[in-house]
UniProtKB/Swiss-Prot annotation:
It is an enzyme of class 6 (ligase). It comes from the Bacteria. Zn(2+) binds at C333, H384, H509. Binds 1 zinc ion per subunit. This is Threonine--tRNA ligase. It comes from Clostridium botulinum (strain Okra / Type B1). The keyword ATP-binding applies. CDD domains: TGS_ThrRS (cd01667), ThrRS_anticodon (cd00860), ThrRS_core (cd00771). Belongs to the class-II aminoacyl-tRNA synthetase family. Residues 1-61 form the TGS domain. Its cofactor is Zn(2+).
């Protein structure tokens, strides 16, 4: 008999060799029906896996991230099977699950079209209805290569040949289709109830621009049609809110072929950016942070010392200065460490909180670039905190509260994820345990719900990630708190303790916006371009009905500017209705309309983007109203 420990701590005994699916049935027939995959001792596996030793078990459904992943991974295989049935000469490349669904890359001597996608979708429905079992099997290296050669799958042969010697080579078979795959998958194609093919794109084999361009088909999969319908509605809404489209229409930013991945901020975009950065500075000063600035370019030796060279050099840009090798910084932390190291510190100085709005450069593949969301140059709102081990909990709690304040201001809900030690990590087991427990204790002490993401921490320490949920249900990872014992060790950081001896500080890396550019992109989509008044590039649009009101309009403009209200005027010889419509398209919070009646009464006719016509009021009354709104930072 073997002992199986369930997620709730309950221990059950079963015969050795029992399948996970059978355990799910014994736990609950309802759970068995919903089950898609399982976690055994933290590793995601198929439900058909047999258990031969005592293990911890978590049954995964579509509500779980890895359950969703398994279902969508199977969706990718169903797509490939449908394509091979219809077009046997097509060659398969790769087909993973991704956050929003899945994709598969194909080599074909014809171009996939929307009409062809409809045919493929119809074939997918047949395969789902046929309800083929997914059967895993393994082969020795040579047999695996021969199987793929027989199937004329050159890309699969290349993948196998690149695997290390001794690596397990596994395949999944479903009906007449077999694919090279590590898994996991759901038990049968019938579990994938609803599939939709979404779009087409080009993709270089292995992301290398020197390789062949393949055709990528994107899709998504759900266990219920209602969930798919909801998702498709969200996609339609997202198109209307696309920050690239709105950024152009509202004249906020642009991206040019002379600098792909390097955004240009226009005057209106800079207003939004400067407000966000000013607010960030104010709140950090209140919270006891001191701002620093570090250079963009630093000697290559620094990146070897920090460990970034071993873990990150593919994403870095390099240059040569005076016959020396330098790198443009991809992260701010090593520069911040040099600031700490520049002075001797006492335990009385700790915690020391150093903040930086630092510009970083990271090489992203051209196909991954996306507006402000994925760029090659961005400003990271970093802070690095240095503390004793005893201060970890209190400091992390303080950071969580600061992050919460920021996100609530912008109307975001969010969820929290604790990511633990990855395989590719630095440091001792003891350090990782202290660091991970420190983050857990901070979260537990304030009753913050979180989920554990095993093995997804940074290479130098565990982390807490904050995922924003926007108004149409999408999630964005922005804030992070990363505990680090490794950097202080590598840079020999110290402080003088109460005992007069040198001690090693603990370091915390953290961001709130994450990337200022990306956060602006998220806000554009969150508000659909209609920024709240305090954040709007133009807060008031001032317009006259005829030239007779021009002098009064200029006086009103001057008064608004004296009160630090951002105003634009529209004195064109156009009908007032046209001017109002244009201001509405520009998402301006308030329009002040001036006709002869307003001039005579010394008033302004106010129209609100949100509430429509508010009638005529004195300019003083309007200024008081808008200043109160700006001060309150209401959404």
């Amino acid at each position: 008999m073997i002992k199986i420990t369930l997620k709730d701590g309950k221990v059950m005994e079963f015969e050795e060799g029992i399948k996970i699916s059978d355990i799910a049935m014994k736990i609950s027939p309802a759970l068995y029906k919903k089950a898609l995959a399982a976690k055994i001792d933290g590793e995601t596996m198929d439900l058909m896996t047999e258990l031969h030793k005592d293990s911890s078990l978590e049954i995964l459904t579509f509500e779980d991230e890895m359950g969703k992943w398994a279902l969508r991974h199977t969706g990718a295989h169903i797509l490939a099977q449908a394509v091979k049935r219809l077009y046997p000469e097509v060659k398969l490349a790769i087909g993973p699950a991704i956050d929003t669904g899945f994709y598969y890359d194909f080599e074909a001597d014809f171009t996939f079209t929307p009409e062809i996608l409809e045919k493929i979708e119809a074939e997918i429905k047949k395969i789902i209805k046929e309800n083929h079992k997914l059967e895993r099997f393994e082969l020795p290296r040579e047999e695996a290569i021969n199987l793929m050669k027989e199937n004329n799958e050159d890309y699969k042969v290349e993948l196998i040949e690149d695997l290390p010697e001794g690596e397990v080579i596994s395949f999944y078979k479903q009906g007449d289709f077999t694919d090279l795959c590590a898994g996991p998958h759901v038990p049968s194609t019938g579990k994938v109830k609803s599939v939709k093919l979404l779009s087409l794109a080009g993709a270089y084999w292995r992301g290398n621009e020197n390789n062949k361009m393949l055709q990528r088909i994107y899709g998504t999969a759900f266990t219920k049609k209602s969930e798919l319908d909801e998702y498709l509605n969200m996609l339609e809404e997202a198109k209307k809110r696309d920050h690239r489209k709105l950024g152009k229409e509202l004249d906020l930013f642009s991206i040019h072929e002379e600098g792909p991945g390097f955004p240009f901020f226009h005057p209106k975009g800079m207003i939004v950016r400067n407000i966000l950065e000013s607010f960030w500075r104010e709140e950090h000063t209140k919270a006891g942070y001191q701002e620093i600035r570090t250079p963009l370019i630093l000697n290559e030796a620094l990146w070897h010392q920090s460990g970034h060279w071993d873990h990150y050099k593919e994403n870095m840009y390099f240059t040569n200065i005076d016959d020396g090798d330098y790198a443009i910084k991809p992260m701010n932390c090593p520069g911040g460490i040099l600031v700490y190291k520049n002075s001797m510190h006492s335990y009385r100085d700790l915690p020391l909180r150093l903040s930086e709005l630092g510009i970083v450069h990271r090489h992203e593949l051209s196909g991954a670039l996306h507006g402000l969301m994925r760029v090659r140059c961005f400003t990271q709102d970093d802070a690095h905190l240095y503390m004793t081990k005893e201060q970890i909990k209190e400091e992390v709690v303080g950071i969580i509260k600061l992050i919460d304040k920021f996100y609530k201001l912008f109307g975001f809900e969010y969820f929290v994820e604790l990511s633990t030690r990855p395989e590719d990590s630095m440091g001792s087991d003891e350090d990782w345990e202290i660091a991970t427990n420190g983050l857990k204790e901070a979260l537990d002490s304030i009753g913050k719900e979180y989920r554990v993401n095993e093995g997804d921490g940074a290479f130098y320490g565990p982390k807490i990630d904050f995922h924003l949920k926007d108004c149409i249900g999408r999630t964005w990872q922005c804030g992070t708190i990363q505990l680090d014992f490794q950097m202080p060790e590598r840079f020999d950081l110290s402080y003088i303790g109460a005992d007069g001896e040198k001690h090693r500080p603990v370091m915390v890396h953290r961001t709130i916006y994450g990337s200022v550019e990306r956060f602006i992109g998220i806000l554009i989509e969150q508000y659909a371009g209609a920024f709240p008044t305090w954040l709007a590039p133009v807060q008031v649009k001032l317009m006259n009905i005829t030239d007779a009101q021009y002098d009064y309009l200029k006086k009103v403009e001057e008064t608004l500017k004296e009160n630090n209200i951002r105003v634009e005027i529209d004195t064109r010889n156009e009908k007032i209705g046209y001017k109002i419509r244009e201001a509405q398209l520009q998402k301006v919070p308030y329009m002040l309309i001036l006709g002869d009646k307003e001039v005579e009464a010394g008033k302004v006719a106010v129209r609100s983007r949100k509430d429509g016509d508010l009638g005529a009021i004195s300019l003083e009354e309007f200024i008081e109203k808008i200043k109160n709104e700006i001060k309150a930072k209401t959404n």
